[in-house]
Swiss-Prot record:
Keyword Repeat: no
Source organism superkingdom: Viruses
Protein name stated in the entry: Tripartite terminase subunit 2
Function of the molecule: Component of the molecular motor that translocates viral genomic DNA in empty capsid during DNA packaging. Forms a tripartite terminase complex together with TRM1 and TRM3 in the host cytoplasm. Once the complex reaches the host nucleus, it interacts with the capsid portal vertex. This portal forms a ring in which genomic DNA is translocated into the capsid.
Subunit structure: Associates with TRM1 and TRM3 to form the tripartite terminase complex.
The gene coding this protein: TRM2
GO cellular component, one term: host cell nucleus
Compartments (UniProt record): Host nucleus
Keywords: Host nucleus, Viral genome packaging, Viral release from host cell
Signal peptide range in chain numbering: none
Keyword DNA-binding: no
Family: Belongs to the herpesviridae TRM2 protein family.
Gene Ontology BP term (one): viral DNA genome packaging
Length: 134
């Protein structure tokens, strides 16, 4: 029985080879599933390579591509949630680059907590330095 499954898997085709191209592009997934996945046949899975050639040229390594995706995700988040360069207003704080960031209440709370955490760590480091010098 295990031999049957192995032979079925090695002899199986990919769905993109079975389904005609025009039907794959134009037909709904539910209709395709009803039409092609009714039998007990096992199909191989394929993944399309979706990264544009320009990205491959600029970032040839996987690590570079992941760093790029991470940066653009953070940039999109910053733009969406109001961290954009604007004129100085009452509800904004200036960062080290001279632009302004509109900070929501959650951001203000996190900044306060991180400042308190940094001050506690600095006190521990000062104490460590004093004890080390003794």
């Amino acid at each position: 029985m295990a031999g049957e499954n192995t032979s079925r898997r090695t002899g199986s085709a990919r769905l993109d080879e079975v389904i005609p191209e025009f039907e794959l592009v134009s037909t709904d997934v539910k209709i395709l599933a009803e039409k092609y996945l009714q039998d007990e046949r096992i199909y191989r899975i394929w993944f399309e390579y979706l990264i544009p050639d320009e990205i491959d040229l600029i970032f040839p390594t996987t690590d570079g591509k992941l760093n790029y995706l991470s940066f653009t995700k953070r940039l999109a988040s910053a733009i969406r949630y109001g961290r954009i360069k604007t004129a100085v207003s009452n509800n904004s704080s200036s960062n080290s680059y001279g632009s302004t960031e509109h900070v929501c209440d959650h951001g203000t709370s996190l900044c306060g907590r991180s400042e308190r955490f940094a001050s506690v760590i600095n006190r521990f480091l000062d104490l460590h330095q004093i004890l080390k010098d003794c």
